[in-house]
Curated annotation (Swiss-Prot):
Compartments in which it is found: Cellular thylakoid membrane
Cofactor: heme c
Membrane topology field: Peripheral membrane protein
UniProt organism field: Aphanizomenon flos-aquae
GO molecular function: electron transfer activity; heme binding; iron ion binding
Record-stated family: Belongs to the cytochrome c family. PsbV subfamily.
Stated name of the protein: Photosystem II extrinsic protein V
Cofactor: record remark: Binds 1 heme c group covalently per subunit.
GO CC aspect terms: photosystem II; plasma membrane-derived thylakoid membrane
Length: 119
């Protein structure tokens, strides 16, 4: 699958900025399949299938977070269920790995369309 620059252009921030991912960054993002897909296969959240990883759902998550997992509404910490804080699989992920995974999550809806996140 060859991804042109248009597809590899993903949101950078909430002010409308974008960034073009390199093919190497796209490849590194496949770390998602190793580290996250057990609970988020295809961008669907195993524990709450009403909340996926599609851009619209991510935009509505409050507060914005990456390293402190909470429920979608931000009310409850979920570090006791598989997450970055508790699972052995996440202990070796660096900030660069997390960035690559986040880029993958932003790229997938552009690659697979509405299949990502189950919507």
């Amino acid at each position: 699958l060859e991804l042109d620059e248009t597809i590899r252009t993903v949101p950078l921030n909430d002010k409308g900025g974008t960034v073009v991912l390199s093919l190497e960054q796209v490849k590194e993002g496949k770390l998602f399949n190793y580290a996250c897909a057990q609970c988020h296969a295809g961008g669907v959240t195993k524990t709450n299938q009403n909340v996926g990883l599609e851009p619209e759902a991510l935009a509505g998550a409050l507060p914005n977070r990456m390293k402190n997992p909470t429920t979608y509404d931000g009310e409850e910490e979920i570090s006791e269920i598989p997450s970055i804080k508790s699972a052995n699989i996440f202990r070796n992920l660096t900030d660069e790995d997390l960035k690559a995974i986040a880029e993958h999550i932003l790229l997938e809806p552009l690659v697979v369309g509405t299949k990502w996140g189950g919507k």
